[in-house]
Amino acid sequence: ITMLRHADRVKIGCLAQLVNVIAPIMTSDTGAWKQTTYYPFQHASAFGRGTVLNTIVKSPVYTAKDHGDAPYLDCVVVNNEEKEEVTIFAVNKDLEEDMDVTMDLRQFADYKIVEHIIMHDDDLKAENTEADPYRIKPEVAGKSQIDNGILTALMQNKSWNVIRLAKN
């Protein structure tokens, strides 16, 4: 989200570790599996194309130890004019509370929701492993709707969300 938000200055993003240790793809002698960090990069690569819109977020905040108040909701919106698609990337960082989110997208009033992808697990230390490679994976299961350009969505606590819109 941060790299997209600063796309006017950040022209390329690289992953330092592509395989093993802290990588989005882990391997062993017998197989390979995707870590949870793989999916946000996959979504950004697939759906984060176009113009990053100036996304104004009003959210409850928490106190970060060395950085003062930080919003629970982190969000960026990308408009792909060529494909007539809009994608919302959002993270609810609240560890306990789900968040009802309202977005004013009246400039896209003739768009409909294509899908709401969510990735969530109650256990923050849960991970995908060789034995359980799909423990945490994105699912098209989010709860969102759009009416006259006003989008409402329920974002689970500790969740990554991708809401895709397309012109009717």
What are these regions (language model features)?
Residues 109-151:
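Acidic, Ser/Thr/Pro-rich beta/coil linker or hinge segments at domain junctions
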Residues 1-74, 81-84:
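Aromatic/acidic polysaccharide-binding cleft in carbohydrate-active enzymes
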Residues 147-168:
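Beta-strand-rich recognition/accessory modules
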Residues 25-26, 100-102, 125-131:
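Short conserved micro-motifs at the rims of enzyme active sites and ligand-binding pockets
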Residues 15-16, 28, 89-91, 119:
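Generic beta-strand/beta-sheet core signal
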Residues 70-110, 116, 158-162:
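Carbohydrate-binding surface patches
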